[in-house]
Amino acid sequence: MKMKKLTSLCGCLLLSMCMGVGAMTAPLSAEAAAREKVILDADMVDLFDDGIAMMMLAESPKMDLKGVTIVIGNTWVETGTASAIRQLEGIGRTDIPVYMGVNETVRKDRFANMKEEKRIYGRGHDSHLGAAGYPQPASWQAEYRKNYNDEPVMNPQKEHAADFIIDTIKKHPGEVTIVAIGSGANLAAALDKAPEIAPLAKRVVYMAGAFFCEGNVMPTSEFKFGLIRKPLKRLTALLGRSKSSCRWMFAARN
C-alpha cells in the first residue's frame, strides 16, 4: 500500500512538473514552423522511459508531437493505449492523438518460443517477458478502468497506427522524425504497406539492442529484438536500401 501511494505521489509530482514546464515554455506562433515534427511509436507504460519520453516530447517547445502510436512489446496494445491516454490527460494534452497498432508478434508461437528459449539458454539479467507475461486484455477501456479506477476523457483514433505513420510522412516529406521506442512493428507494417515512405522520413531513432553485453531477457537477445525479429529485418533492409538522407539511428539499451 505504501509503495502504491509513493508511486501515485511521484506520478503526480512529475505530471505537475511537466505541466509547469509546458506553461513556462509555450512556443510562440512564429516558432511553431521550426519545431521538429515527431511521431512517438511506443509499447507504452506509466512513466519509466516510454511515459517520460512522451511527456517530454509533448511539452518541449522544440518538438511538434504529431501523434503517439502504440505497439505490442512491454505491454499489449490495449494496456499501452490506456496508459498513453491517462498520461496525456494528466498533463492536459488531450489534443495529441493516440493510435492503436500492431498487437501480435507476427509469428503466433513467438511468446511460447521465448519462454522455451529462456529455459534452454538461461535468462539474461532480468526475467522480463513484457506482454507475454500476462493475458491479453479485453479492451483498452477495460484496462483504463482497472488500472486507474476512472473513466477516460479521450479516445484513441480509429485509424490504424501504420496508416497514420504513412499519411503523416507523405503529408510532410523530409520533415518527420520517427522515435521508435517500442518493438518497431508499427513502422515495419507501414513500410510493408507503403515502402515509398522510406526516403520521405527525416530520420528514425530506434531504441533496441544490446551492444557489448548480454541481452536483458536472454544472454543471446535483447527483449525487443527477441520479440519481433522478422519485422525488424524488413525494417532495416528497407531503410538500408533507401537512397535518401533519412538517418537510421540506434539507441542501445543495457
Please give the residue ranges for each predicted region.
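N-terminal acidic, glycine/proline-rich low-complexity segments
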Residues: 27-254
